[in-house]
Amino acid sequence: MAKISKRVAANKAKVERTKFYPIDEALSLVKECASAKFDESIDVAVQLGIDAKKSDQVVRGSVVLPAGTGKSVRVAVFAQGEKAEQAKAAGAEIVGMEDLAEQIKAGNMDFDVVIASPDTMRVVGTLGQILGPRGLMPNPKVGTVTPDVATAVKNAKAGQVQFRVDKAGIIHATIGRRSFEPAALKSNLAALLDALSKAKPASSKGVYLRKIAVSSTMGVGVRIDQATLSA
């Protein structure tokens, strides 16, 4: 524990908590502070100028990160007939209907993303209490309920991330790994922020993207000076 404490203390000493860092410096700091023995994820937290308690200001969606997430994704698809074949051809690991539903009910969930064709929702709808709490329930708002299951599978494999604002009005998402080049992290962050801007509720007033901070799994948070994002 002493070694961990010393490492954390050393990392905290490198970052001024109240300072807003230029994007390039912020990403370099985060990578430098990601000193665990595994390839830490690089995460972003975005404080939005919304009232998360209002139903018309819930921000939710998905975006395919141009540099991917650095994570291998296993995809399960509810589809039948031709769409099932298309899902398999696109790379889905598991494709089924009632058989897949029974597998899930039995607790066998060896997948990271669930995609469903609209005509399968009579089966998928019975799994809400199982998939919902795990963030796996297919939803048209994030592109996981769609007639084009093949494209949805390819997007999931290519590095699509889903986002949803929490009760505090903050979006949390992963934009890569410590092993990523800064340019890759920067392009992924830009793609996420662009998706968030497009998802801005019409009823949201004032500054929308209020604060942005990046961190690693075991590292400290670094605030970003938004004026440098377009640099």
Swiss-Prot record:
Gene3D superfamilies: 3.30.190.20, 3.40.50.790. SUPFAM superfamilies: Ribosomal protein L1 (SSF56808). Pfam families: Ribosomal_L1. GO terms for biological process: regulation of translation; translation. InterPro entries: Ribosom_uL1_bac-type, Ribosomal_uL1, Ribosomal_uL1-like, Ribosomal_uL1/biogenesis, Ribosomal_uL1_3-a/b-sand, Ribosomal_uL1_CS. NCBIfam families: rplA_bact. Belongs to the universal ribosomal protein uL1 family. Part of the 50S ribosomal subunit. Binds directly to 23S rRNA. The L1 stalk is quite mobile in the ribosome, and is involved in E site tRNA release. Protein L1 is also a translational repressor protein, it controls the translation of the L11 operon by binding to its mRNA. This is Large ribosomal subunit protein uL1. It comes from Ralstonia nicotianae (strain ATCC BAA-1114 / GMI1000). The lineage of its organism: Bacteria, Pseudomonadati, Pseudomonadota, Betaproteobacteria, Burkholderiales.
